[in-house]
């Protein structure tokens, strides 16, 4: 795998990973695709594609933030699962949420493992990671979110969750392996179409993402450290810390925002982002 940091000195690498950490934190939990922005921002700044390993490792900051933010929810889920095993109380909301999280994680684990085993290097250089592909995907996902916002009945709450909900949203999460889709965007869109209230859909999306993002970050951490070997681990540490702080702020803001507002802001942003990227690419012809 090419070393995207080979031409960067220590401070340049620190600055790059600080920016990537901020971008990661802002975009991981908003339905606008962190992968797209982590690919596009370095290209626009002439840093080159940092690669899957570096971006996945920086996502560890986001997972620290989401675990810390939802620590009480996760503790309740663990207690609910424990009670269910001891007393057979599988219909309790906390136990059902735990089951939904487990069921929803299986599809992306299976597909992600298949990619890692059989298409790892090809995925890094895939046309799916090109600027025009990301632009088109962003536009398509904006239109799907618009349909979900317009048509979703918004009746379900998190306390209504079932294993079936976990499977539906988990299958949508698999789409996030396509650069530009947005894990948060695909799961939020599926949840809205399935009748969830906005804030509860976002909350479930965040909780469902914890296992997948954690495993991806840990798996790629070794390669990420190797990719930044010339500059040492400091740049990656800075990126992870920045992602942690900004992710916490983004989670808190989005949950409060969706209690009072619709997702049309994100539909508009994704459309403009996609169209803007296509316009930029048509002028510069960059990939």
UniProtKB/Swiss-Prot annotation:
InterPro entries: UppP. GO terms for molecular function: undecaprenyl-diphosphatase activity. Pfam families: BacA (PF02673). It is found in: Cell inner membrane. The chain crosses the membrane at residues 50-70, 99-119, 128-148, 206-226, 231-251, 263-283. GO terms for cellular component: plasma membrane. GO terms for biological process: cell wall organization; peptidoglycan biosynthetic process; regulation of cell shape; response to antibiotic. It is a multi-pass membrane protein. Its EC number is 3.6.1.27. It is an enzyme of class 3 (hydrolase). Keywords: Antibiotic resistance, Cell inner membrane, Cell membrane, Cell shape, Cell wall biogenesis/degradation, Hydrolase, Membrane, Peptidoglycan synthesis, Transmembrane, Transmembrane helix. It catalyses: di-trans,octa-cis-undecaprenyl diphosphate + H2O = di-trans,octa-cis-undecaprenyl phosphate + phosphate + H(+). Bacitracin is thought to be involved in the inhibition of peptidoglycan synthesis by sequestering undecaprenyl diphosphate, thereby reducing the pool of lipid carrier available. Catalyzes the dephosphorylation of undecaprenyl diphosphate (UPP). Confers resistance to bacitracin. Belongs to the UppP family. NCBIfam families: PRK00281.2-5, undec_PP_bacA. This is Undecaprenyl-diphosphatase. It comes from Parasynechococcus marenigrum (strain WH8102).
